[in-house]
């Protein structure tokens, strides 16, 4: 009896162990959580069942395109505005990364004429990257003024302060190296790198300014060469006249200031045209919109000026005759309608100032304000 009871108890314990073992294994598998199965197991605090979920950081995106950074879209920091941009929205120049907006304005060298040629969108974006409000700007000139006031806000002021600190760190590193040759402070290397950045930026601006100045100088020299070529084609007499004029200007410096450019109204007769210099003849033709590009000799210019003078005299005469005819016609027109001829006498005053049609409508004379009794039509013989 006892042996049968013990064997039954052992079989029950073995069955219990098998059930508990399978439950424990199922509880540890990933597909079967701890709450499923015949037995529930409470996980201890020291050994959690599942690994904690990874906390995701803030999603940083590109300031220009708004896309998140990845392996193929690397993040770069603009050296001017200190904002994050991707590789497609930034430009690499001299080992420096700038965003497209800062690079566009950097190319203008912050000159007002060049900034006025840019789009309003680029100017506004440049100011927004530096946290400068643009709500009060109504015109493009306001944006340009703000850009000139706040240029280099993100990098210029910082670079100025860093340059001071770099100079101090360099001096300190010099003294420390003299006493401690084995120790090289890292601040000296950082300051030297910042100094190189400042030098590169200064050289870039100076190169732009020198290029603009050289272009202006070359343009001025081209103009002077063109004028010299034109003067070489003149005769010796013209050179003598120019020398005489220069001598007069040297003797009387106030005369050159008072002397104006030659005009057609200064001529009183055709004989004066022969005594004028080539430069004066060209000035007269240019002021009257006459082309003289094909003229190689002085006599050709003289002929053009003579023809211009004659045409001007004829135009003045014809204009005077037309004005006289117009005055006569105006004298014979009705003073009320200015359309019909005066052919009416107003009685009792006897004034003739209107046509018959207007005289019948008048209640009083427009000259003497006398009451009109009758308007009589008059025929001119």
Curated annotation (Swiss-Prot):
Domain (SAP) spans 115-134, 273-287
Task: List the SUPFAM superfamilies hit by this protein, alphabetically.
Answer: FYVE/PHD zinc finger, RING/U-box, SAP domain
Example GO BP: cellular response to cold
| Compositional bias per record (Acidic residues), positions renumbered to this chain | 221-249
Q: Where is this protein found?
A: Cell membrane; Endomembrane system; Nucleus; Nucleus speckle
Annotated Gene Ontology cellular component terms: cytoplasm; cytosol; endomembrane system; GABA-ergic synapse; nuclear speck; nucleus; plasma membrane; postsynaptic specialization
Report the pathway entry. Answer: Protein modification; protein ubiquitination
Q: Which Pfam families match?
A: FYVE_CARP1-2 (PF21272), RNF34L-like_3rd (PF22968), SAP_RNF34_RFFL (PF23632), zf-C3HC4_3 (PF13920)
Q: What class of enzyme is it?
A: transferase
Q: Which PANTHER family match?
A: CASPASE REGULATOR, RING FINGER DOMAIN-CONTAINING (PTHR14879), E3 UBIQUITIN-PROTEIN LIGASE RNF34 (PTHR14879:SF3)
- Describe its assembly: Interacts with CASP8 and CASP10. Interacts with p53/TP53; involved in p53/TP53 ubiquitination. Interacts (via RING-type zinc finger) with MDM2; the interaction stabilizes MDM2. Interacts (via RING-type zinc finger) with PPARGC1A. Interacts with NOD1.
Could you tell me what this protein is called?
Answer: E3 ubiquitin-protein ligase RNF34
């Amino acid at each position: 009896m006892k042996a049968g009871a013990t064997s039954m108890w052992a079989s029950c314990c073995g069955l219990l162990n098998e059930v508990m073992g399978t439950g424990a294994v199922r509880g540890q598998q990933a597909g079967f959580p701890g709450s499923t199965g015949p037995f529930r197991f409470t996980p201890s605090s020291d050994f959690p069942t599942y690994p904690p979920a990874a906390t995701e950081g803030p999603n940083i995106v590109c300031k220009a395109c708004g896309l998140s950074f990845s392996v193929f879209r690397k993040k770069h920091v603009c050296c001017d505005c200190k904002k994050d941009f991707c590789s497609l929205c930034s430009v690499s120049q001299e080992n420096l990364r700038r965003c497209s907006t800062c690079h566009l304005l950097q190319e203008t060298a912050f000159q007002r004429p060049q900034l006025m040629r840019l789009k309003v969108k680029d100017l506004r974006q440049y100011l927004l990257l530096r946290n400068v409000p643009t709500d009060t700007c109504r015109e493009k000139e306001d944006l340009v003024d703000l850009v000139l006031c706040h240029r280099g806000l993100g990098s210029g002021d910082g670079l100025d302060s860093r340059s001071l600190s770099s100079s101090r760190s360099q001096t300190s590193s010099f003294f420390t190296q003299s006493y401690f040759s084995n120790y090289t402070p890292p601040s000296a290397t950082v300051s030297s790198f910042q100094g190189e950045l400042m030098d590169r930026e200064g050289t870039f601006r100076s190169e732009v300014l020198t290029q603009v100045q050289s272009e202006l100088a070359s343009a001025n020299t081209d103009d002077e060469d063109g004028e010299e070529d034109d003067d070489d084609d003149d005769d010796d007499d013209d050179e003598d006249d120019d020398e005489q004029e220069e001598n007069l200007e040297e003797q009387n410096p106030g005369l050159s200031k008072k002397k104006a450019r030659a005009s057609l109204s200064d001529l009183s007769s055709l004989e004066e045209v022969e005594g004028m210099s080539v430069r004066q003849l060209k000035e007269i033709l240019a002021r009257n919109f006459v082309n003289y590009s094909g003229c190689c000799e002085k006599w050709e210019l003289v002929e053009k000026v003579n023809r211009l003078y004659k045409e001007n005299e004829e135009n003045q005469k014809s204009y005077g005759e037309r004005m006289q005819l117009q005055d006569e016609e105006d004298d014979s027109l009705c003073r009320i309608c200015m359309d019909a001829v005066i052919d009416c006498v107003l009685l009792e005053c006897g004034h003739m100032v209107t046509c018959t049609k207007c005289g019948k409508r008048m209640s009083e004379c427009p000259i003497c304000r006398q009451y009109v009794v009758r308007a009589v039509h008059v025929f001119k013989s």
